[in-house]
Amino acid sequence: MTGSLHYLRFSSAFFALLGFLGATIGSAATEPVPPVPADHVQRFGRGLKDASIALETSGNSKPISKSSKPFSGWPFQPLATVTPPSGSLPTSHPVDGFIAARLTEKGLSLNPEADRRTLLRRASFDLLGLPPSPEALEAFEQDTAIGAWDRALDRMLAQPQHGERWARHWLDVARFAESSGFEHDYDRPGAYHYRDFVIKALNADMPFDQFVHWQLAGDEFEPENPLALMATGFLGAGVFPTQITANEVERTRYDAMDDMLSTTGSAMLGLTVGCARCHDHKFDPITTQDYYRMLSTFTTTVRSLRSLDLNPEQTQQQLKAFELEQAGLVAARTLYEKKILPDRFEAWLRAGDGWKVKADWELLESPEWKSKAGASFRSMGDGSVLVEGKNADYDTYTFTAETSTADLRSLRLEALPDPSLPQGGPGRADNGNLGLSRIRVFAEPRSGGIRHEIHLVRPRATFEQNHGSLSIASSLDDDFHTGWAVDPKFGTRQAAIVDFETPVQMPGGIRLTVELEFQVNVRHHIGRPRISVTSQTAAPFDPESVPAEIRRLLSRINSPGNSPESLSSSERATLMSWWKTSDEGWRAAQQRVELHAKNRPKPALTSILMCGEGYPALRMHTQGGDFLPETHFLHRGSADQKRGVATQSFLQVLMKSADSESQWHWQPPAGAEYSGRRRSLALWITDTREGAGHLLARVIVNRLWQHHFGQGLVTTPNDFGVQGTPPSHPELLDWLASELIRGGWRLKPLHRLLMTSQTYRQSSTESELKLRIDPSNRCFSRHVPARLEAEAIRDTLLWITGALDPTQFGPGTLDESSRRRSIYFTVKRSQLIPILQVFDSPEPLVSQGTRPATTVAPQALWLLNNPQVREWASRWASQEGGNPRSEPDLWIHRAYQRALQRLPRDTELKASRLFLAQQMERYRTGGTSQPERMAATDLLHALLSLNEVIYVD
């Protein structure tokens, strides 16, 4: 043998023998197996001998590579300029011209067009994954005007179910799942956003080149677009071990990058790029150098969780309205400060008795402290307690004490510093902060009686972290995420005062219970609290809490020989700025401002799983870094055998000139934290003139053809290389790829183009001639009936029975009783949905270009015996119009139209009528309370189990 491709050439007897052995091994027959013909055995032996000799004489020939021998395979050639043949068909459709030319060579022709019911049902399942409604079918059958078929297609392409249907095809290719796989199979919160992106992109008919750009580098193309960031979930959808020792970090990282590259190659280029990891590709012109230089694209790409506002425009509108209202409240407070506050301040100064600094605060008798989370309290001898022991994430302190005072009007909570607290306190958080989410006060007679809650008003504090969500006012609402905090005033005494809306008056004394709830942030509890009460209203803070400048001014005007008139204008302004916090009118205006500020619209942040650079990596149980700073060439794929640093390039066979990768290299803007390598890869993949764009177009066009015609023009959609199958109609494939590019890479026009052809619309009638000449239908001489995929089967049953929930997008579920479309099931690799597996849904481990379509007993058994199917049938029976007893024919007609999109045949009508009558009688005889309902359920369940429901002609 010469050259670099190794082939085993066996005789026809060899393949006949292999076929015989395969059929024998795969059969379930119990009859004795006939002996293998002797001449076949002899020829089989000679074939093996010849093959071994050929391999031995091949010497040390190297695998094919760009450097040794240029490969001229069809996938790597530019798109051919093709003119559609003008065949003998009455149709002028270009697709039919290509198909008819091949059929003519074989002495065949297209089948006649299928009937309208079959066509609409076929198209509805193809485009929507659901059957057409009886109303839609009737409207189509009655629309005899020119263009009826085109209009029907346009209506379906515009429906939101289209994206759900075709997203499922792409998610197979993208090996999409929402867990990491392996033995722990941890969930990936936010991964479902990638699924939602695919649905939205397909419904919006996003150009396919942009669809590819965003999946590879959405964060580099449009870093502020949430949808573009969601799209990058494509790269991170693969399996990943989440328990990684230090010795495994490097190998695991190369595995993760290989998954990204291999999936990109299979899904977008139809090439098994990953086969060049350990050596030059044995069949395709891909070298290990190509592999590692392309692999370096993903050197610093990591999975990351980002919290994003998915509706920024709505948030901006809400903020605009909020700021307008807030400005009005601030203006009202400013007007009060200018027109009213000065006179009230002067009256306070003239009164004189309001100058005293310290309120008459009383420490309650025998206080008792309790911690819900189990912390302990140590008395400090000054009425305060030091909180010690367990510092749980969240806690609630309960303070109970008594007083003989019969009239209480205010309560003061002090948060004292202490050397034992972090940063000196006053909180127990690592930085010394606190977060009081709610304060509640209850009172009851000291001698016993009914306890009631006191309504707290006019909150004020020595210091607040802000005047909104972290103010003392926010400790009086029911939002546990907001509350009093004091950052950065650590290591100092802080205090808060609240007044009682109505004085608490109990002649025999009062028992008070105070609850302090801490849920603003983890471990943000007060470290040394002290509580006191007073009978004064709007009492000021004691001297220690009053700023030094204010204490100085108050002391001066209180000293003999001085009066308020001795204050300068600036001193009066300083004093009034402090005093106004005790003025009821100003506090009311300020409270309106602050309460409104608490309601400032916040973006509804949603966590999405994305892949990118410069973001915090999603942490795994890894004893090492999240990525490696460089990608190396690895000898035989071993991370222990590095052979130099790999710099980014692409597949040489898909570049017009060697080492010309610089034309696609994109330089990120200054300050960007991403490398631009993934955007460079995306630009090369979609470049139809110099890069891989022509192959990208061929691959996606082939995928569309595959799902409309049952098999692709290339039957190995993930492998266009030597090991794949060549296209049955290469000129048609190139012409369709060119049409896609000329049409701006939009897929919906291509769907329409394919489905308006006579090739698509032909019937599935078979003939002996076609079965003999075109047994596998590679010439597309007929339409081949096909079973629906697992998701479409379940969705169809839900739709027929009226149980389908059309809600789109959002988190999925593992609950099999969910009535949403099957694409919204959570894809957990260790907990796949059984019904989908029964009908051949693949495991999402690697890119899947095709699904098997098996026929096994559990499928029929599931339809007949599954409780959910029975429940759906019962639901349908309760909703179906008409009476199966008094109007059986009408009722049966409606049931057949809903389930099979046709009326029953005479024999079916007669059999169904008889079945209903017999079942009603059986249930009535057996004492069933609803014999008609039960009999109807039985018949409808039988209809759901028909092959006709899950097969499409």
Residue ranges and their predicted role:
Residues 27-31, 40-84, 168, 179, ...:
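Post-cleavage N-terminal segment of exported redox proteins
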Residues 31-32, 80-92, 236, 240-257, ...:
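Electron-transfer interface patches adjacent to heme c in soluble/periplasmic c-type cytochromes
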Residues 90-121, 126, 130-161, 176-223, ...:
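Primarily short, surface-exposed interaction patches in extracytoplasmic proteins
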Residues 220-327, 543-548, 836, 848:
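Sequence context surrounding c-type heme c attachment/ligation sites in exported
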Residues 347-396, 403, 419, 442-508, ...:
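Disordered, acidic Ser/Thr/Pro-rich linker "stalks" and the adjacent N-terminal cap
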Residues 404-410, 506-513:
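Extended extracellular/luminal ectodomain segments enriched in beta-structured repeat modules
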Residues 415-417, 515-522:
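Short beta-strand-plus-loop segments that form exposed binding edges in beta-rich domains
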